């Protein structure tokens, strides 16, 4: 999870398994006022997902003031007939006495089915969230094997790990102007060779990502490689390339290559 808002670009399924429960968490791109074709596609993707789920979780940051973006989404919830649970995350960053006023503030704006304060980082109250969700979900056979934790491919996870490191290490200009594509993966018995392309829309962003004497991209590669090796369980050789594609977020060809071709009208 990135600390920077609105950086999710794809629907990501995370599967929670216990002996008698399977819950599929579907993380969608954040709904926002779109300024380009990519933004419109991400919004459409998020809205399409609503039809396929049983419960909506509205995740917000309890440590920041309720803002225009929150109110924009709450206004959209008026047309939703499914249960909507508000999750106030990052309660570890505020005082206990601030939690109830925060709950009351949101309660005045929408009749949430539940409001649950948690700290995902500290795992505070997350067990309660699971118990509440179990009460809202229908009985069903498991969709996934009990050992499965995500439906995402290795190629997608690798590109997201690289993009995550870019977001962690660069300034606020970069997040919405970068995407990563895993171009090639070659497996051997003892190692994996990976080539990943980092795409930005301006030349100065390429310079930021490469850094002085290539120091930034080396650090991005080092951190990403460590996580990829943990993911895949093998030695990884990671090659990172940076390419400038002006206005790529308005170019249907590139957006289609990212897997969004089903969301164009």
Residue ranges, per PLM feature:
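Canonical P-loop GTPase G-domain recognition
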Residues: 82-85, 91-156
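Conserved, well-folded catalytic cores of nucleic-acid-processing
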Residues: 15-19, 34, 49, 53-56, ...
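Short beta-strand-centered segment that lines the nucleotide-binding/catalytic pocket of NTP-utilizing
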Residues: 1-14, 26-28, 233
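P-loop NTP-binding site
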Residues: 154-265
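Flexible beta-alpha connector loops of hexameric P-loop NTPases
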Residues: 1-2, 31-39
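Solvent-exposed alpha-helical segments within well-ordered globular domains of core cellular machineries
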Residues: 10, 14, 44-51, 68-75, ...
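Conserved C-terminal guanine-recognition region of P-loop GTPase G domains, centered on the G4
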Residues: 16-22, 26, 41-115, 169, ...
């Amino acid at each position: 999870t990135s600390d920077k808002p609105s950086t999710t670009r794809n629907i990501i399924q995370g599967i929670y398994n216990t002996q008698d429960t399977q819950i599929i968490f579907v993380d969608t791109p954040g709904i926002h006022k779109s300024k380009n074709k990519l933004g419109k596609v991400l919004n459409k993707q998020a809205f399409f997902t609503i039809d396929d789920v049983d419960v909506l979780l509205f995740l917000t940051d309890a440590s920041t003031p309720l803002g225009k973006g929150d109110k924009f989404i709450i206004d959209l919830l008026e047309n939703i007939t499914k249960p909507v649970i508000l999750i106030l995350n990052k309660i570890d960053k505020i005082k206990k006495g601030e939690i109830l006023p925060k709950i009351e503030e949101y309660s005045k704006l929408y009749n949430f089915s539940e409001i649950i304060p948690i700290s995902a980082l500290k795992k505070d109250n997350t067990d309660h969230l699971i118990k509440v969700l179990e009460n809202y979900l229908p009985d069903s056979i498991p969709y996934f094997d009990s050992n499965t934790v995500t439906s995402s491919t290795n190629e997608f996870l690798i590109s997201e790990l690289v993009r995550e490191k870019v977001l962690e290490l660069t300034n606020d200009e970069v997040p919405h102007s970068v995407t990563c594509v895993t171009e090639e993966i070659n497996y051997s018995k003892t190692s994996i060779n990976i080539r990943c392309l980092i795409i930005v829309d301006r030349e100065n962003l390429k310079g930021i990502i490469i850094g002085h004497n290539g120091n930034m991209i080396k650090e991005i590669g080092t951190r990403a490689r460590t996580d990829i090796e943990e993911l895949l369980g093998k030695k990884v050789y990671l090659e990172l390339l940076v390419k400038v594609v002006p206005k790529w977020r308005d170019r249907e060809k590139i957006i289609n290559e990212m897997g969004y071709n089903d969301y164009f009208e």
